[in-house]
Amino acid sequence: MKIDFIIPTLFRDTLDRAVNSIKKENIDHNILIHGDVKDGRGCGNRNEGLKKVIDSDWIIFLDDDDYLNEGFSKQLDNNYDVVVLRMSQDASNPFYPPKVIPRTEDSRLYSGNVGCNFAIKTSLYLKHKWLFSVTAKNPDWDFLARVLEVTNKTKVTDEIYYVAPMGGYNKVKPTGRK
């Protein structure tokens, strides 16, 4: 199995941690890091990564300030087209309590209950070639919602495999201002 990891980056000091979390898994992979598109949302950089997807089995999106827990690749089951890696958010944020999405009591996929914490089968992506929209209110959900229009073969992991230590804290202050 080969995985393409698409990392949109602001070239933060946490990028190495993100990359190392991939390398620790000891799997065949491509790491596609893009930071040249300045749209303020990571959409353009994710799209640049998607343009380079060719020979993998799966695509995983990983923000440069996030990381993956060991064992995530074992969750990628070929019986599914989408695997949502349950995410821990805000564990290091002093202003908000940590939360898990999808919520443990609610594994349904909808805006606010999933972020960029999903893997998509490469063959499905190449058939449709969806892109992230910078004008979407929630670009990650907008992308995933379009995927879910063509497949119901989805899995949500029981355990947390995607960690976003600061959630939105490093992007927006508690006042809601940047």
Regions inferred by a protein language model and the residue ranges of each:
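A recurrent flexible, glycine/aromatic-enriched loop bordering the glycosyltransferase active site
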Residues: I101-I120
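Short, acidic, metal-binding catalytic loop of nucleotide-sugar glycosyltransferases
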Residues: R17-I33
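Acidic donor-binding/catalytic loop of UDP-sugar-dependent glycosyltransferases
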Residues: D66-D77
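Acidic donor-binding loop at a coil-to-helix junction in glycosyltransferase catalytic cores
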Residues: A136-F143
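Active-site donor/metal-binding and catalytic loop motifs
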Residues: T157-R177
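Short beta-strand-to-loop acidic/aromatic patch adjacent to the donor-nucleotide binding site
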Residues: S56-Y67
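Glycine-rich, basic loop-to-helix element that forms the pyrophosphate-binding segment
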Residues: K38-V53
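Short beta-strand-to-loop element that shapes/binds the nucleotide-sugar donor at the catalytic cleft/hinge
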Residues: V83-P97
